[in-house]
């Protein structure tokens, strides 16, 4: 089994940056490993659609298909792993529950390491939460480069 100590430390460092920058949530949206950020944080890959939620309070949530959920659970990195029947409503429901005001997503105009969210995945995600929530989206390039530097990546 893979050792997740490094990834646990990375998640801790990300949480500290979220607090420092007053960003409520870092949300990674992926499908079939499309976002290379998942190799760094959380360090768990998915075959199906997946989402990883990291709050500034230190809560960690994984949303995974039945096929992927076991790996996400066995990593020991998450407070809760939600197996979805309907990915879109599960992600939207968790966003509503968390009710963030500022959300960091993995997009960037200047840092390719922070630009793993595809336009198609982004538009699909936005279409499924439209009218349900309002929050400011910011780039993960506000903190990921510093976290990578501290963790020698």
What kind of feature is each model-predicted range?
Residues 1-93:
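N-terminal accessory/capping or targeting/presequence segment of soluble
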Residues 6, 86-153:
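Flexible, acidic/His-enriched mid-domain "rim/lid" segments that flank
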């Amino acid at each position: 089994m893979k050792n997740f100590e490094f990834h646990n430390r990375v998640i801790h460092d990300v949480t500290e940056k979220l607090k420092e920058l007053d960003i409520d949530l870092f949300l990674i949206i992926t499908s079939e490993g499309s976002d290379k950020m998942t190799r760094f944080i959380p360090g768990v890959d998915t075959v199906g659609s997946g989402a990883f939620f990291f709050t500034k309070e230190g809560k960690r949530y994984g949303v995974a298909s039945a096929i992927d959920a076991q790996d996400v659970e066995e990593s020991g990195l998450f407070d809760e792993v939600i197996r979805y029947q309907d990915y879109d409503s599960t992600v939207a429901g968790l966003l509503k529950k968390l009710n963030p005001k500022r959300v960091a997503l993995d997009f960037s105009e200047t840092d390719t390491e922070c630009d793993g969210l595809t336009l198609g995945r982004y538009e699909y995600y936005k279409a499924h939460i439209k009218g349900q929530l309002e929050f400011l989206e910011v780039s993960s390039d506000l903190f990921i480069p510093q976290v990578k530097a501290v963790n020698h990546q």
